[in-house]
Amino acid sequence: MKSYEVNFDGLVGPTHNYGGLSYGNVASQSNSQQASNPREAARQGLAKMKALADMGFKQGVLAPQERPDVAALRRLGFSGSDAEVIQRAAKEAMPLLVASCSASSMWVANAATVSPSADTADGRVHFTAANLNCKYHRSIEHPTTSRVLAAMFSNEQHFAHHPALPAVAQFGDEGAANHTRFCRSYGEAGVEFFVYGRSAFDSRYPAPQKYPARQTLEASQAVARLHGLSDDGVVYAQQNPSVIDQGVFHNDVISVGNGEVLFYHEDAFLETDAVLGQLQAKLASKGGNFQAIRVPRAAVAVEDAVRSYLFNSQLLSRDDGSMLLVVPEECRNNERVWAYLQQLTSQGGAVKEVKVFDLKQSMQNGGGPACLRLRVALKESELAAVNPGVIMTAPLYDTLLQWVDKHYRDRLGEADLADPQLLVECRTALDELTQILKLGSVYPFQRQP
């Protein structure tokens, strides 16, 4: 039976704005309070989805969240009608309103961790929604994320869903942004690679000094247990604390893996040789031939990697066995990074081609191509069990473009978030979207009695 890696990209929500909410994310903080263009952001994301689908890659869509999150504001003590809640928050605590309007759920690499059926004890695909405990504006996402994933992957014969881990710092979990998987082919047992920033309970592990380590070892271990992964199919690695302090807030900002290949920066991990040795040995035991592509700091400094998002790229397997690297426009605009990529593709190695996309609206908020997608490896029978409404096709692309143009504003500043009409616009748009994607009632406003 054939197997595929399906990329489910986050559809940018209608409240996309530059709130500067993500401490430790250089782009997010440096572009704080600029005016955004939600319509352009959504169109840029859809263009990437459509282009990759047209190239033969399996592509799906993950719906955005309901924002502003009025229920979250009510939990913080704001009362009255929905409009009054928004206006009170704007008057008394604007940062809380900005957080409740964040469209950060577009970065679905943080939505969940996914283990394919070939790796799990019960032979089902397992999903654990990420608690995103480190940032308030993201910590409110997981209940809706869980409902959306359950609506997309509803067949219990094939799919198992786990709630987010306890929402405390010791189990800080950022999902697939700190997880990748190596395998000979997508349908065969592979090696799942969990990268953490610190240990919650063992003080012997080093930790960053400037920016927070968002993922704990204990969270990664808990997800592996929930998914029924065997020890011979798991490798844990600690991210280098010094690169976290340079703005590498997730591992997908400093490395990317796919198939048998890990593309990583020289400074990405602690004890790199031991980590690579484990990956090589465990993948070999499953019939695979692990390949590591190391990018030396002399060629690309960590600062350049963070500014260009070289590693926040998609490494995609083509039918001929070669790989395509999908990068943001910022890589082409960085002389050192672009020179390295030209050298990489001319060497005759696994990466044969680089494809560039304009994702400026997302990039200015600190999210590149890899942030925008959640990878799910599926056998043919499992893919057939996925809700067909979320699989990208030419008609769906056209429908979603029309939907975006109908409902999204082309300019959004901080003051606009206080407009109660924005809430009405967003709910109207999302109500229509759930019909387009055949999701049912996944949003809080649709579930109110």
From Swiss-Prot:
**InterPro entries in the cross-refs:** AstB_sf (IPR037031), SuccinylArg_d-Hdrlase_AstB (IPR007079)
Composition-biased stretches, type Low complexity, lie in 27-37
Q: Which GO terms describe its molecular function?
A: N-succinylarginine dihydrolase activity
* Sites where the protein binds substrate: 19-28, 110, 137-138, 214, 252, 365
Q: What is its EC number?
A: 3.5.3.23
BP-aspect Gene Ontology terms: arginine catabolic process to glutamate; arginine catabolic process to succinate
Q: Which Pfam families match?
A: AstB (PF04996)
Segments of this protein annotated with the region Disordered:
23-42
Pathway membership, UniProt: Amino-acid degradation; L-arginine degradation via AST pathway; L-glutamate and succinate from L-arginine: step 2/5
Q: Which reaction does it catalyse?
A: N(2)-succinyl-L-arginine + 2 H2O + 2 H(+) = N(2)-succinyl-L-ornithine + 2 NH4(+) + CO2
Q: Where is the active site?
A: E174, H250, C371
* Key words, A-Z: Arginine metabolism, Hydrolase
The keyword Hydrolase is annotated on this UniProt entry? yes
The superkingdom of the source organism is Bacteria
Q: How does it assemble?
A: Homodimer.
Role of this protein: Catalyzes the hydrolysis of N(2)-succinylarginine into N(2)-succinylornithine, ammonia and CO(2).
HAMAP family (alphabetical):
AstB
The family assignment reads: Belongs to the succinylarginine dihydrolase family.
Give the protein name, as stated in the record. Answer: N-succinylarginine dihydrolase
What is the scientific name of the source organism? Answer: Pseudomonas putida (strain W619)
